[in-house]
Amino acid sequence: MNSTFNQTDSGIFSNRTEENLLCCNFSSVVTDNGFAAAAPDERSLFIMRIVQIAVMCVLSLTVVFGIFFLGCNLLIKSEGMINFLVTDRRPSKEVEAVIVGAY
């Protein structure tokens, strides 16, 4: 019974990291002109960064215009409320007479 659980016997759970690492030499890819080729991850990271910048610009403009139009709407409503509360004042005839008389 002890022979089935022998520590030297790897069984199903064998440690194959050494065998997996031997197949790759981790050298860079070299093109025809001798320079190392750029990793495709760099290009995708660059594109992702550009997309992030574009999305942030669009969101920023949306927020700025939203605040602007909300402020304009509140300003229009407040002017309407002020005009509703203020009674119309008409200049008296005396004021017109004074203005005409001054010229």
Swiss-Prot record:
The chain crosses the membrane at residues 50-70. It is a single-pass membrane protein. InterPro entries: Reprimo_fam. The keyword Membrane applies. Its main location: cytoplasm. It is found in: Cytoplasm; Membrane. Keywords: Cytoplasm, Membrane, Transmembrane, Transmembrane helix. One of its GO terms (cellular component) is cytoplasm. PANTHER family: PROTEIN REPRIMO, PROTEIN REPRIMO-RELATED. May be involved in the regulation of p53-dependent G2 arrest of the cell cycle. Belongs to the reprimo family. This is Protein reprimo A. It comes from Danio rerio (Zebrafish).
